[in-house]
């Protein structure tokens, strides 16, 4: 085969109009986007464009789910209730998802699947398309109150202690699940001890390290290569505990300040300007959704769940502004013994 023939498919693809290319890219799973960005400058531009996010939104490629934990006097009677967000009606609809029996501490989504880890020496995987639950390969050790992160087709589970004895299980601080080989192995031990963790995110623009929010209110940066940990000083003592990444920028909500973003070069938190709903909310949950920031809160007085969809714009090198695209009540008459358990985004239907 001649060189011209080998290059023909790539050349023909580059000649297609951008609107056709966008429709093709919108149907490609998001975890392939970093690879596509390396093909050409035009593809790199289109993969990160707002037009692609809008196209994916119209195709309903991303969906978000909310799980509530129904508390009872007996731990064995604790139940979980799942709801799916319906965008055209802007409401939460109850769905018959099956949850693991154990109160799993951490979740991680990979495409349409939700992984549950922590609390016991097991891992469960929920397929959001079928609602079916299956058990995955057993972790090396159990871990209570641990954090998870996904980097390069590997799930990192780290931190967490034996809640009874207040020590790390068998001296293992971190364990890694290889999605390709479906096997677990010991990961780089953390250079500091992190007992209680409650949120983690990964951002490719910052060296594919894992950022973890702990109960000490600090954010710890875990380096997957050697286990080295650095700390980010919190902007305020009253944060929501939840954080997310939108376009490779980390966001966190602070009750006394508002929504903030992390400026990695200066190593400081800055306020997202232009938002008027800053205040004290109960049970905050935030996540990236179609390139926007979905901001959920629980109004306990009215027993309602509300959501604001926020557009973020500006430069992470200068300033970032936010604009509320819409704010709407998603659920009413929520029982008083229901609490937020999981808020997760599944992609690529």
From Swiss-Prot:
Entry-linked PANTHER family: F-BOX DOMAIN-CONTAINING PROTEIN (PTHR24414:SF99), F-BOX/KELCH-REPEAT PROTEIN SKIP4 (PTHR24414)
- What Pfam families does the entry give? F-box, Kelch_FKB95
| UniProt keyword list | Kelch repeat
The record's SUPFAM superfamilies line, in alphabetical order, gives:
F-box domain (SSF81383), Kelch motif (SSF117281)
Which parts of the chain are Kelch repeats?
154-204
InterPro entries, sorted? F-box-like_dom_sf, F-box/kelch-repeat_ARATH, F-box_dom, Kelch-typ_b-propeller
Q: Which SMART domains match?
A: FBOX
Boundaries of every F-box domain copy:
11-58
Query: What CDD domains does the database record attribute to this sequence?
Result: F-box_AtAFR-like
Protein name (Swiss-Prot/TrEMBL): Putative F-box/kelch-repeat protein At4g02310
């Amino acid at each position: 085969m001649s060189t011209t023939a080998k290059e023909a498919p790539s050349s023909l693809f580059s000649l297609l109009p951008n609107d056709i290319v966008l429709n093709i890219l919108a149907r490609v799973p998001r975890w392939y986007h970093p690879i596509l960005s390396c093909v050409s400058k035009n593809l790199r531009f289109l993969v990160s464009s707002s037009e692609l996010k809008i196209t994916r939104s119209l195709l309903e490629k991303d969906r978000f789910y909310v799980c509530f934990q129904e508390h009872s006097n007996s731990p064995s009677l604790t139940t979980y209730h799942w709801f799916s967000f319906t965008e055209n009606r802007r409401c939460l609809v109850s769905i018959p998802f099956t949850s693991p029996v154990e109160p799993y501490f951490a979740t991680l989504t990979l495409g349409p699947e939700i992984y549950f880890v922590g609390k016991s020496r097991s891992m469960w995987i929920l397929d959001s398309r079928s609602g079916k639950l299956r058990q995955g390969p057993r972790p090396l050790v159990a871990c209570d109150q641990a954090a998870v992160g996904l980097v390069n087709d590997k799930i990192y589970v780290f931190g967490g202690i034996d809640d009874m004895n207040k020590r790390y299980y068998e001296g293992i601080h971190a364990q890694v699940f290889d999605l390709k080989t479906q096997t677990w192995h010991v990961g780089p031990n953390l250079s500091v001890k992190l007992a209680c963790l409650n949120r983690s995110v990964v951002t490719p623009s910052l060296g594919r390290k894992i950022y973890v929010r702990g109960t000490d209110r600090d954010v710890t940066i875990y380096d997957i290569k050697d286990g080295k940990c650095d700390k980010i000083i919190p902007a305020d003592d009253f944060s929501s505990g939840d954080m997310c990444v939108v376009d490779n920028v980390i966001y966190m909500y602070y009750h006394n300040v508002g929504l903030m973003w992390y400026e990695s070069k200066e190593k400081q938190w800055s306020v997202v300007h232009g938002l008027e709903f800053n205040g004290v909310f109960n049970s905050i949950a935030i996540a990236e959704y179609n390139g926007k920031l979905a901001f959920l809160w629980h109004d306990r007085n009215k027993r309602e769940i509300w959501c604001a969809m926020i557009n973020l714009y500006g430069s992470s090198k200068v300033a970032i502004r936010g604009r509320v695209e819409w704010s709407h009540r998603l659920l009413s008459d929520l029982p008083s013994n229901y609490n937020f358990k999981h808020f997760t985004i599944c992609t690529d239907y």
